[in-house]
Amino acid sequence: MKDKVIEASALDFAYQKQSILHDINLTVYAGEIYGLVGADGAGKSSILQLAVGQLLPANGALKILSKDAADPVLRDDIAYMPQGFGLYPDLSVQENMEFFADLHGLPAQQASIKIRDLLQRTGLTGFESRRGGNLSGGMMQKLALACALVHEPKVMFLDEPTTGVDPLSRRAFWQLIDDVRADGVAILYATANMDEAERCDRVGLLEAGRIIRQGTPAQLVQQQDAYLVMVQGNDIRHYRNEIKQLPGVELAFPIGLRLNVWLQKSCTLESFRQSLQQVAANLSVEMSTASLHDVTLRDLVLTEH
């Protein structure tokens, strides 16, 4: 059994008397990526800021390596990549890394060896003298990750680290993150990107400051009490409202030239097909495999209602 590294229990947070987080419960193990998935304002960043001691909870407990998250002794065991990366634009790539190495008390020789290794792993070798403010988004991301890893943390908190970077940089970033996970580091990863959520070991779906569902991506798909079908035909969007009123239909979302329809399990595919023909004879329906994006969208819409 892997060690528990991050533990949140009945965690609440409020700002200026406004409740932001409600009864957050989650556990992250060594060598695991836990994805906090939700839209802007759902509470992802607040959880990370609580985890690194920038904010204090109103109620509940948040433990990192069995210590209170606000305990300063944790400073050298954790790494935090905030939105915007938190780099120093007037310092060079080398100077940024040296600053963070010094911040965590690495001896000069050890820091030099580690920085050289991370420059190579992140593809920044040859850019040591370039100012942080002159880097592209993808290179800033690589530098931020290198700075976060320079002291070999046991825990990482990443706040939407791939926002605004190109697909190739995102892929390279995830290759590095997979290596970090393999080294046994526990990672709490905030994202609104469903493709990234699929790569996490487990995810927690956040809505309005609450975790409304959590588990592996496969479990979240399997836990649904409805099933997904795809409806196609000419002018499909024209029939959306009528289809939503059919027996057994829970939700209907237009996706391109088709309609994704969630059906209650009590509604058979054949009975829905017959009802559909009453709407328009040219409409066809077939089973569809739900993705994490599909079930997340369903959960969020149902929660809002």
Regions found by a protein language model. Name each.
Residues 98, 102, 109-127:
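Conserved ABC ATPase "signature" region
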Residues 131-135:
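Conserved ABC ATPase signature
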Residues 60-74:
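Conserved ABC transporter NBD signature motif
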Residues 156-160:
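Catalytic Walker B motif of ABC-type/P-loop ATPase nucleotide-binding domains
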Residues 52:
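Helix-to-loop junction immediately C-terminal to a conserved catalytic motif
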